[in-house]
Amino acid sequence: MGQGLLQIGLTLCIVIAITPVLGRYIARVFLGERTILDRVMNPIERSVYVISGVRPKDEMTGWQYIRAILYTNLFMGILVYSLIYFQRLLPWNPNGLGVPSWDIVLHTVISFVTNTDQQHYAGETTLSYFSQVAALGFLMFTSAATGLAVGIAFIRGLTGRKLGNFYVDLTRGITRILLPISVIGAIALVLLGVPQTIGETLTITTLEGGTQYIARGPVASFEMIKMLGENGGGFFAANSAHPFENPNGLTNLIETIAMIAIPAAMIYTYGVFAKNIKQAWLLFWMVFIVFVILVWVAAGGELQGNPLVNGTLGIEQPNLEGKEVRFGWAETALWAVMTTATMCGAVNGMHDSLMPQGLFATLFNLFLQIIWGGQGTGTAYLFIYLILTVFLTGLMVGRTPEIFGRKIEKREIVLASLILLIHPIVVLIPSAIALAYPFSLSGISNPSFHGISQVVYEYASASANNGSGLEGLTDNSLWWNLSTSLSILTGRYVPIIAMLLLADSMSRKQTVPQTPGTLKTDSLIFTTVTAGIVLILGVLTFFPVLALGPIAEGFKLASGS
């Protein structure tokens, strides 16, 4: 127990230490200030702009920024679909893999272009090295940079700046942040035992005389951007539970830190943009405290173990089902909460084997989307709740709602409400349909309370652009591929459109002078109220589902049945 808690504590301390450093660096990149990589990256970026015809000094309006995102993502999606469809004709296919079915290719492309990386296939038996690295690896960089650009544009709008240029933000996000850190991280992973090869699957003879096939590939480079970009899609079916993706405790620590580094730093980045570091730290600690509570809930459940198993065997041991022994209950519980909090979706153990407490914590993260949140967009979601808090507290005390010196009016509240309503709509309605018809129910491996969790988790993960799943669900079917694709697209692009329109609206407003009656948003009281509103809205929206799923399952286990 002590060792497990020490591992969790060490990881959290590292997160706190790197947040201001990386947050300040990200701010310098997108504020156009000098950075250590200027000498190397400036010529590369200028070449990219010249070749693509981008004028980096041109500012975009909200709709121009939105159209740039949609057109770019559509083009990249069509390109990658074509690459996967013709993978049998392309190089780096030593195992001679053919073409997957059209629906799995469509789901995969939609999933990766939106930074969701939900996988209904096994990478080592479905996709060639070229499809994994050149096609999906390309999307891992661009989808992460797209989310990062949205988050930065949203922060610019809230702080009274123009939104910027999407193509410039996309390029700088890759060249100055994602690519350099990924290169360093990939080298570290190679040194720690993660393979990086284009050799074919090995065929070996075991000690018993049998034949075993060992899949391998260019894993290290794929793995690092998978974690850093909050992508989460694994090179192998077992994801980061596979010893070739995550062989030991040190690689596990590196990947865990990479997973949370940018979402945590983005809160500090806002503080630099707004010139209000105090508020950034208040918001950071608000998110951090809720995160630690959820880790405590999940870790406590795993440490307690399964009461039915322990009672039958007459022992007291943690729940080790679905876990890698090299990580144990503590690192698996921390990872499970972190991967759903950051919308990464990678796993180092099977979430379907989590105790009800752990399942509650992971679902709660998927429902809220702000306990760190996704790449860039999570920060935007956090400030949506901040805007609603200002509006509600202003109504209660009779003050005109203002935030960052700008009035909050009907348009902003309508857009904020739309952003928060889309997620439950594209989670709960498809879940109800899936639970109502036999053709979708056939994929559920557990007909009880856990079966409800399997279905809701699948759609919550899709809509939140997380990508993890309770793998007791047989999800590689036409229904699940198409229905989750719809949830992914709606949950990704509708909020992004609304966020950018809201930011554009705020950027055009005149600054209102502060008065003694102005509500201060950088106070402990206001931050506490914000946390309360976040939790209340999350509980009110999804509590019936939580009650029918992990809460009911927990009571059933506690009763000994």
Swiss-Prot record:
Chief location: membrane
**One annotated Gene Ontology cellular component of this protein:** plasma membrane
Q: Name one GO molecular function term.
A: potassium ion binding
Q: Where in the cell is it found?
A: Cell inner membrane
Q: How is the protein disposed in the membrane?
A: Multi-pass membrane protein
What highest taxon heads this organism's lineage? Bacteria
Kindly give the InterPro entries that the UniProt entry links to this protein. KdpA
One Pfam family, short name: KdpA
Does the record's keyword annotation contain Acyltransferase? no
Q: Transmembrane region positions?
A: 2-22, 66-86, 135-155, 177-197, 253-273, 280-300, 327-347, 354-374, 378-398, 413-433, 482-502, 531-551
Which keywords appear in this protein's UniProt record, sorted alphabetically? Answer: Cell inner membrane, Cell membrane, Ion transport, Membrane, Potassium, Potassium transport, Transmembrane, Transmembrane helix, Transport
| PANTHER family assigned to the protein according to its UniProt record, in alphabetical order | POTASSIUM-TRANSPORTING ATPASE A CHAIN, POTASSIUM-TRANSPORTING ATPASE POTASSIUM-BINDING SUBUNIT
Q: What does this protein do?
A: Part of the high-affinity ATP-driven potassium transport (or Kdp) system, which catalyzes the hydrolysis of ATP coupled with the electrogenic transport of potassium into the cytoplasm. This subunit binds the periplasmic potassium ions and delivers the ions to the membrane domain of KdpB through an intramembrane tunnel.
Subunit-level organization: The system is composed of three essential subunits: KdpA, KdpB and KdpC.
Family note: Belongs to the KdpA family.
Q: What is this protein called?
A: Potassium-transporting ATPase potassium-binding subunit
Q: Which organism is it from?
A: Nostoc sp. (strain PCC 7120 / SAG 25.82 / UTEX 2576)
- What's the encoding gene here? kdpA
